[in-house]
Each structure stands twice: as C-alpha cells, then as structure tokens.
Amino acid sequence: MEEKSRILKKANEDQSRPISFNDSFGGGDNQLRFLLKHLPDESFKDINLILNSTNHDLIEKEKINVLWVHHFVNQAEITNLGSKEYVDKLDWIVFNSNWNFEKFVYQFKIPESKSAVIRNAI
C-alpha cells in the first residue's frame, strides 16, 4: 500500500487544486480512487501519477511522470501544457477520451508520441 499511499498523499497535498482531493468527488477524482482500488500497489512503483494539475512542483525527476488529464483545455490547472519546458518533463499524458486528446493537441500542440487515450474507468 506504500505506492498508493504516496500517490494519494501527493494528490491531497497539491495546493494548486481549487479543492483538496479528499474533499473532491468529481469524475477524475473518483476514477483515480477506482484505479487505486483495483490495481496492485506494485503497479505504481516508479510512477508519479499526477491528476489534472500541471504544477511544476509535482514533477519527480526520479520517477516516470504521468499526467492523467480529465479537465477541458480552458481549466487553469492544466495551462502549463502550453509550456514546452513543462511538457518535456512529462513521460506520458493520458486522456480519458479521444475527443479530449484532440482538443489538447489542437490547443497546446502537445506531442502525440507522449500521449495515450484510455476510456473512462467508471
């Protein structure tokens, strides 16, 4: 449970969020809870899973940085995707739909080679 606890702690301590993770029950937050509930702890070893936030402070150089995006392109929390410097620090950007992925590619010109689309987990 060490890896899952690390991810949850980081999500809850993210000050760039308008509301703490523990107090938020939006779709993206609930999908993260569902993912953590059903995958074994070792699945998250060496992974820095970042939910809907492009805060530079959340990047961990020694881990694989995965930004999981559920927000739309106009949300303040993800505006750093417009920064090449920030995007270069990410290993993967995961989207919850093809539609959302296409909007981000158009808006931020993010590299498709760093992007993946998964369907909603719930």
List each model region and its residues:
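N-terminal pre-catalytic "stem/leader" segment of glycosyltransferase-like enzymes
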Residues: M1-T54
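Active-site proximal beta-strand in glycosyltransferases
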Residues: N48-A76, V94
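A short helix->loop->beta-strand "cap" motif at the edges of active sites that frequently abuts
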Residues: E62-I64, L90-D91, E112-K114
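A conserved, positively charged/aromatic
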Residues: N80-D91
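A short beta-strand/loop micro-motif in the catalytic core of glycosyltransferases
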Residues: L90-N98
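Carbohydrate-associated surface elements
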Residues: W99, A121
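Phosphate- and divalent-cation-binding pockets in alpha/beta enzyme and binding domains
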Residues: E102-Y106
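Hydrophobic residues at beta-strand termini and immediately following loops
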Residues: I118
